[in-house]
Amino acid sequence: MLNRLRRTKIVATLGPSTDINNNLEKIIRSGVNVLRFNFSHGSKDEHKSRANQAREIMTRLNFHIALLGDLQGPKIRISKFIKNNIFLNVGDFFILDANLDQNNGNQERVGIDYKQLPYDLKVGDVLLLDDGRIQLKVIKSTGHEILTKVVIGGILSNNKGINKLGGGLSADALTEKDKKDIILATEINVDYLAISFPRCSNDLKQARKLAKEFGSNAKIIAKIERAEAVLNQNTIEDIILASDAIMIARGDLGVEIGDSELAGIQKKLIRTARQLNRIVITATQMMESMITNPLPTRAEVMDVANAVLDGSDAVMLSAETASGEYPAETVIKMAKICKGAEKVPSINVSRHRIHAKFDDIEEAIAMSAMYVANHLKGITAIITMTESGKTALMTSRITSGLPIFALSKNKETLNLASLYRGVTPIYFNSKNNNFKAANEAIVLLRKRGFLCRGELVIITQGDIMGKIGKTNTSRILKVV
């Protein structure tokens, strides 16, 4: 192996900053693996234009990068103030009024966009506005009005979000806007579709069904950001199993469960997702200071590194690339942090499912290949010749410290695999089967500079190339 490859993937959000100065191509060249379209912001035409530009760059550079559409979901917000903002003092009484015109907020009251909110609350509940910067205690909730008392005050401006401490708001996971955005996601052919604020597995099943009805085959990502979603281990597992991947959206989740609980929940979610053979993205404020600064803080470096050490498939950038001043520099710095953390030996050994029995042949082959990778001296790489990408995904659930090359002629499969930890997707289209195809794969990777003569590699493949679900062979070959 000539160069150590970065195993943890980087998700970057597109926005005004990537629209200028050739920044989209710069972040792609800097190492982005997934491009995120945040449907909370931007117009339909802007998203389509960015998708077209991204595909042109990917084709020209011969890069395999996944597109991720992120639905806004039922984010509950206050309306607008006549003077754009107010200052709330501790002890003030303040009314949230479901019937107030959306532009008529004042020092005493403001409108809300979720008319059901007064019926979801009881006396004593605590509402968290603007990511918890403002806290209101419910004194009375009747009809269309919620009378509150300010517990933590400060400046409150237009359209700030509302959360309930401990969760429990009944808004549906998919709004009418989300349904329109699923159509948009289908039109730009995203590989992944992120569902915001799911409370249970049924929310994800409904989203998957709706996406398929609109013609999308996108894999479903569950954004974990409600307290109900992490209520207990059974709920966590149900949500993970109903999705193809999860995103730990630490902003709203931290507001609802409390920041002090966040670190433990993050580790539990990552561990559980990997055990259940699902992908996991860690997100929110990872390199926040680089929105306006050319270097991250030491705390941000440690945050990214810890997400890598926890086993995240990917770490995500939001405003850092969408509206920040240093989008490419942020990606470069994050990539360096990931590679630095990946040097730690303790994360390169895994006993995951070492004693498990399998009903699925592909999974058994993947597990056996990774067992050999961790126990036979001299192995330098794992090569999975795959149609659907399933074998590549399964092998990536076992930590070995070795690169996994997913070889396929299916470009959609290669795009999906760009999110899998430790997996490098490579286009490969052989007319041969078995041993000849395996040797062709080795020659290709050696010519690309990934392998050296004399190294040992593990190859998984099926007897017949081009058939989904037919992986039944694992072999060890020497690079010549």
From Swiss-Prot:
Residues bound to substrate: R36, G251, D252, T284
UniProt catalytic activity: pyruvate + ATP = phosphoenolpyruvate + ADP + H(+)
Cofactor(s) essential for the protein: Mg(2+); K(+)
Recorded GO MF terms: ATP binding; kinase activity; magnesium ion binding; potassium ion binding; pyruvate kinase activity
Pathway this chain belongs to: Carbohydrate degradation; glycolysis; pyruvate from D-glyceraldehyde 3-phosphate: step 5/5
Residues reported to bind ATP: N38, F39, S40, H41, R77, K160
EC number: 2.7.1.40
Binding-site residues, K(+): N38, S40, D70
Activity regulation comment: Allosterically activated by AMP and by several sugar phosphates. Belongs to type II PK.
Binding locations of Mg(2+): E225, D252
The keyword Cytoplasm appears for this protein: no
Site (Transition state stabilizer): K223
Keyword terms of this UniProt record: Allosteric enzyme, ATP-binding, Glycolysis, Kinase, Magnesium, Metal-binding, Nucleotide-binding, Potassium, Pyruvate, Transferase
InterPro entries in alphabetical order: Pyr_Knase, Pyrv/PenolPyrv_kinase-like_dom, Pyrv_kinase-like_dom_sf, Pyrv_Knase-like_insert_dom_sf, Pyrv_Knase_AS, Pyrv_Knase_brl, Pyrv_Knase_C, Pyrv_Knase_C_sf
NCBIfam families to which the protein is assigned, alphabetical: PRK05826.1, pyruv_kin
Family the entry assigns: Belongs to the pyruvate kinase family.
Name of the featured protein: Pyruvate kinase
